[in-house]
Amino acid sequence: MNISTIDLIVFIAYCLLILLVGLFVSRRGKGETQDASNYFLAGRGLAWWAIGASIIASNISAEQFVGMSGSGYAIGLAMATYEWIAALGLLIVAKFFIPIFLEKKIFTMPQFLEERFDRRVKTVMAFFWLAVFIFINLTSILYLGALTIENVMGVPMLAGIIGLAAFAGIYSIYGGLKAVALTDVIQVVFLIGGGLITTYIALDMLGNGEGVISGFTNLCHQAEDKFHLILDKSHPGYMDLPGVSVIIGGLWVANLYYWGCNQYIIQRALAAKSVSEAQNGMLFAGFIKLLIPLLVVIPGIAAFALDAPLEKSDEAYPWLLSNLLPVGVKGIAFAALTAAIVSSLASMMNSISTIFTMDIYRSYLRPKAVERDVDACGRMLGQ
């Protein structure tokens, strides 16, 4: 993709905005103490809109934009099944899980396991989750994020990895969860804005000058097969979708774990002002999940209807950015992709720091550590 000067200015402005907001909200107020609750749980003072936005920002990464658009191109709207089931999962977690977690006043999920079982279970799961987060989640977000940026924007892989890690680390290490959550609100605006703009332009082009509604109508006619939610067994994408038995069975195990027991998702709800704020935040996140197909899958179907000359379906979203978006808007779209990566990285870094500090450092290495030392350990580990 060719990047114009205007696009570059828009992207740099986005980076500066995120850094400035992150550093600004990281400042300690007058009389504010330097303790674990303030750093890891934002002083237990997050509002519902910050919780919901931060959950979505943590969940979505750049490879999801590219991958789900590619699935929309190859399979169609049926891929939205995963997103819609996730929205229902968020409702269940909000209703049944959140009141229990907040009543316990825990920092981490291993702490909950200690209360429910014993210290041995907590320790085993703390080390397990640290290994998964560090060696699987964090590395995959960095690699796939840098790979996506390399494919879309031509940024070298190594430079992308270093730049993304440094960008996410600057404000997340300094400001803790408060900085992560409040900058996530801005990230979500870019995510939704970039996705909506791409969808609008694609549908407008399909409308042949008659508007977006006409474009969507034409899309439904030109790609009618892409709007089936249940596929025939002969369809090449049949095995990529969950069957009925999976939807009512095994998928819920993964769904409820991810939204209800996954530290870097549930930590936002643990930082809520109250149970109602946490529940409303998760409801807000569920509402946004319902919109994700509009932002991600529909553009892929539009690329199919526009006869995009692709070698692989995953090229659908990059093709739309390269060929449809005007100067200036490309910068917003690139900022949206970067926002998806940076928000996920910052959330993962903060959660790794939280689990190690609260479940290992405070429990075994320095059980008598004062709050200032616990806070310092969290910041040092993030570095």
Pin down the residues of each PLM region.
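Membrane-interface "cap" regions at the ends of multi-pass membrane proteins
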Residues: 1-65, 172-175, 194, 281
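Helix-loop-helix module between adjacent transmembrane segments
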Residues: 56, 78-173, 229, 233, ...
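Loop-to-helix junctions at membrane interfaces in multi-pass transport proteins
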Residues: 2-4, 41-46, 50, 67-81, ...
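Juxtamembrane interface elements at the cytosolic ends of transmembrane helices
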Residues: 16-35, 65, 96-110, 167-170, ...
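Residue-level recognition of pore/gate-forming positions within transmembrane alpha-helices
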Residues: 15-18, 58-59, 86-90, 130, ...
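Transmembrane helix-loop boundary segments of multi-pass membrane transporters
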Residues: 2-7, 70-83, 143-158, 178-187, ...
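Extracellular loop-to-transmembrane helix junctions
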Residues: 2-27, 33, 70-106, 110-111, ...
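Hydrophobic, small-residue-rich membrane helices and short re-entrant helix-turn-helix hairpins
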Residues: 37, 106-114, 176-186, 261-291, ...
